[in-house]
């Protein structure tokens, strides 16, 4: 059961057992749709339809991307939020280039110039694999807290801070109707207690999972050229392979 596999569940008036059961039902329904349609990757619209009137799909995207649930391990299914098809396509490319590794999806939210960090939260979901980067999915799940989703329909978000380690971050963007690929080899780092506490305090009741990306590059250049509010990633360094795949596709 989901509640037994995660580190904790913070029930309140927004996150009830009934709401959580509904989110799990949505996850199982999404798995059925994927199987019925033989999909390789996907994107869920979620906001505002599901978040306002049903339930946020944070459980679905976290588990599908992570490749682990109550039935055990399965092939990770790259899936993005907010109907971001190009984000999902980027995730699929990173999965294939990395040999099948789980991929993640996040918002480019905040730049910490002093700390040389870029904050990468998500509106409520984070691929479960990155909660621990362990081959044992059960151990990763123990690093996740289910906290209230501050959305009209309530439900849970998968709160975690992704583990430190090498990352390849990428994004397919359209510029003047043509694709461009942005690729960064970097790493996630463990934030100091002060940085994490400040982030949590700033979020108030609206808590989100967040990765902290080391910005050992020209931050201003990144801000000027990066052409999206979303970014995708995979564990390891695959800049060369990603570049070669884009070149072979003619972009």
For the regions a protein language model found, what residue spans apply to each?
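Anaerobic metallocofactor- and corrinoid-dependent redox/one-carbon enzyme cores
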Residues: 2-251
